[in-house]
Amino acid sequence: MTKTILGVLSLLVIMSCSIPVKENTVQPNIMETNKKNLGNLLALYPKPMTVVGAEVEGKVNWLVVGHTGVIGHDRILISMSKSHYTNQGIKDSKRLSVNLVSREILPKADYVGSVSGATVDKSEVFAYHIGENGTPVIDASPLTMECEVVDIYETEGFDNFICAIVNTYAAPEVLDNNGKLDYTKLKPVLFEFPTYSYLATGE
């Protein structure tokens, strides 16, 4: 009887060893998706196209800047390549203007973004006046912010100007009946960097 029991137990052990064990191939917390991974592509576009105005070596200069951002509720970021002629003027004066671009002034904005102030006098491309904070304000821009530079954060190849907004000027046609800014009327030109394309708001 004892031999029979031992034989049965031995047979069970052999059978259990011969049964293949399936590996757990399920990876928890990984969701299947049909989205394509584009790597570390910077894709925060389109952005409002702006023309930055500043005084450089005693003369007004204009520069198209597509890399701008909001910091908190009273600061903006203006990110500019270190190679730009305008940077030194901003560093010296610690002030600049940020002018939004409408369709009407897009050709002139495109021009000032394609030539350097180091070799071309761009001071008279736009009709302008000097704002209350001493920066050049484009008359035909639908909205302009005069800013003071409160800090400069340098990254590889770029000067990143942290700016406090001092004055904001808006054209009458972009205001509502209460004199407040109406963003549905503003409709600035947008800029898309990878293909250097201009887009119309809402289109």
Give residue ranges: language-model regions.
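Short linear, low-complexity motifs centered on an aromatic residue
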Residues: M1-T2, A127
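C-terminal motif of bacterial Sec signal peptides marking the signal peptidase cleavage site
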Residues: M15-S16
